């Protein structure tokens, strides 16, 4: 959901002042401008003040739009379809301001937006936990499998009576 900084592409404080109009604020949403146009990140306190690079574009939600709700919408298949449809470029998909303005956002009242965002955070955290536990189980199972094979082929386990 957040932004991972790339220290290899930093700018000097002086240059950052020249780029003040591209400075990100908490609640902004950063989208990839080229290629994978369906990727986005929500600017949090840690990335507040970063400068948006030229291969990305920042959306600043309007008053009445909950940033987390907008970010979750951008994760949806409906948003992905619209972004792909309105993107430009024959070889590499690209987004511009015109394409973004054409995307239709279902916009309930602010309280409902907050409820939707909270619900999705709660449910996806549970799913992410289950995925992590499953991945850990798979890794342990692979280790167990490897140890079992090693033990069987080195004679540490007598398999003659098991087959």
Predicted regions located by residue number:
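Short loop segments at secondary-structure junctions
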Residues: 46, 61-64, 77-78
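Short Ser/Thr-interspersed hydrophobic loop/turn segments at strand-loop and sheet-helix junctions
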Residues: 1, 23-39, 51-56, 71-84
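Short histidine-centered catalytic/ligand-binding loop motif
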Residues: 13, 58-60
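Amphipathic alpha-helical coiled-coil/heptad-repeat segments
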Residues: 102, 107-163
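A short, polar/charged loop-to-alpha-helix boundary motif
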Residues: 42
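A short glycine-rich beta-alpha junction/loop motif
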Residues: 36, 49-57, 65, 88-114
């Amino acid at each position: 959901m957040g932004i991972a900084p790339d220290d290899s592409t930093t700018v000097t404080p002086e240059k950052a002042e020249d780029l003040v109009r591209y400075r990100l604020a908490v609640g902004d949403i950063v989208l990839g401008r080229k290629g994978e146009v369906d990727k986005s990140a929500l600017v949090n306190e840690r990335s507040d003040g970063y400068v948006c690079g030229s291969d990305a574009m920042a959306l600043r939600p309007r008053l009445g739009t909950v940033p987390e709700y907008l970010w979750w919408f951008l994760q949806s298949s409906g948003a992905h379809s619209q972004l792909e449809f309105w993107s430009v470029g024959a070889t590499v998909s690209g987004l511009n301001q015109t394409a973004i303005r054409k995307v239709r956002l279902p916009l309930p009242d602010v309280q409902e937006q907050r409820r939707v965002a909270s619900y999705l955070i709660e449910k996806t955290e549970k799913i992410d936990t289950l995925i992590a536990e499953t991945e850990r189980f798979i890794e342990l199972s692979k280790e167990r499998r490897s140890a079992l094979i090693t033990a069987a082929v080195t004679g540490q386990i007598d398999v003659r009576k098991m087959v």
